[in-house]
């Protein structure tokens, strides 16, 4: 895959800005590209997340949620470095592995109002197995994965024009009917459930991992991965990737508080949130190493490249980390790094394929 070869000329369709949270303490070694963070203090992870992590360690993985393998690098690499994609196409219904929702099912009522966003299909799938047909998902748009959700027996209620409107409606209905509201990312169990992806990476990798690139929406996935990986190996960089026009996490880290965007771009709709979670922001502020911005053209190029290499079609949000890894490695002229990219979704809207082709 040419887009992932570290030693090639800059492509004109890439636009990259590297954002590093200003509150981090770094030890700079040989160059600006070789940055190693000091180990995070135990106090940097909240008690709630720590308790959830301990519970997750003790609780066996459900049989319905097998680990997704790291894909062998093959021609994705330029020796001596390599890129290891974590692909959703190996998982059920094109989503990435198990969800933290599995760790919440013991406290849920028989009916749940759930705003699923960062990985909507896996949330609904896992909940459907646990609780039967009494699942309600709030979301406003008509994406193809919702057909699979409905086939699982979930009732899909589409409301509002944005995720925030859908969440407000779900919270209101849950309060009125005495139900449990399940947030898609800002809950300790959800965060640590997402962190099982980090656990899989560290256990499956056959080489020393230098960096993990993670798509960022509300922040649950990257917060969970960072919470686990930084406790195991603080030298592994955790780098978030956001679209240029949906960069709520980077702006929040820059200002030291959560920032709500006036509007967000909808191309990578799986990460298009106006404001990140409170707990996810705090964890990202303490643990992650930076955020990369990429353009829509860069995302489309990564979708094309993954298809040409693996015959796997990623949705825009799923290709986000891939685009960010390339942009980062070009920016810092990285040629010998072992990189993991989280390809978080393969639920591509068929009608969007033409647009992706034109922009790639």
Predicted region positions:
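PLP-dependent amino-acid enzyme catalytic core
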Residues: 2-360
